[in-house]
């Protein structure tokens, strides 16, 4: 049995498959996911698992070089926005209108659906690399 970190088989497989610049989405329970889109549905009941718990688990295991948020999150869900900023540190953030965000999710390798039930609790994570030429 795995000792720590993410236990979900599908989520582990997804994260291990990501290469540089690949994107994934962590979504609330209301974000529309196209039928043809790969998805990992972690939702159990409204509110569980919460968005931030899933984000924390993914951030612990994935090198992230940039994120995308719906610009509406700043006004419609400022507490969540501040929590995301605190977790992401200096990672560059791109803000786009929610409709554009939904269109961008179609390019992601997968959407991870949480039970989160607050507005605009969605994020696109762009995979980075965990080494640089300075390492050699």
Curated annotation (Swiss-Prot):
EC number(s) on file: 5.4.99.62
Name recorded for this polypeptide: D-ribose pyranase
SUPFAM superfamilies (UniProt xref): RbsD-like
An individual GO BP term: D-ribose catabolic process
Cysteine pairings via disulfide bonds: none
Cell compartment(s), UniProt: Cytoplasm
Organism name: Geobacillus kaustophilus (strain HTA426)
Cited PANTHER family: D-RIBOSE PYRANASE (PTHR37831:SF1)
Active-site annotation: 20 (proton donor)
One cellular component (GO) term of this entry: cytosol
Database matches in Gene3D superfamilies: RbsD-like domain (3.40.1650.10)
Binding site for substrate: 28, 98, 120-122
Pathway per the UniProt entry: Carbohydrate metabolism; D-ribose degradation; D-ribose 5-phosphate from beta-D-ribopyranose: step 1/2
Domain of life: Bacteria
Presence of the UniProt keyword Cytoplasm in the record: yes
InterPro entries: D-ribose_pyranase, RbsD-like_sf, RbsD_FucU
Record's keyword terms, sorted: Carbohydrate metabolism, Cytoplasm, Isomerase
Keyword Cytoplasm recorded: yes
Molecular function terms, GO-annotated: D-ribose pyranase activity; intramolecular lyase activity; monosaccharide binding
Enzyme class: isomerase
Role description: Catalyzes the interconversion of beta-pyran and beta-furan forms of D-ribose.
Assembly with partners or alone: Homodecamer.
Catalysed transformations (reactions): beta-D-ribopyranose = beta-D-ribofuranose
């Amino acid at each position: 049995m795995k000792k720590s970190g993410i236990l979900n088989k599908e989520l582990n497989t997804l994260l291990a498959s990501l290469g540089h610049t690949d994107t994934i989405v962590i979504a609330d329970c209301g974000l529309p996911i196209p039928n043809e889109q790969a998805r990992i549905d972690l939702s159990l009941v409204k509110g569980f698992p919460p968005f931030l718990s899933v984000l924390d688990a993914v951030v612990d295991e994935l090198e992230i070089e940039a994120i995308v948020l719906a610009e509406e999150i700043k006004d419609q869900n400022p507490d969540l926005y501040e929590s995301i900023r605190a977790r992401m540190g200096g990672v560059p953030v791109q803000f786009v209108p929610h409709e554009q965000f939904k269109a961008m999710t179609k390019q992601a390798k997968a959407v991870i659906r949480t039970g989160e039930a607050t507005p605009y609790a969605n994020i696109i994570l762009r995979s980075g690399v965990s080494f640089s030429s300075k390492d050699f």
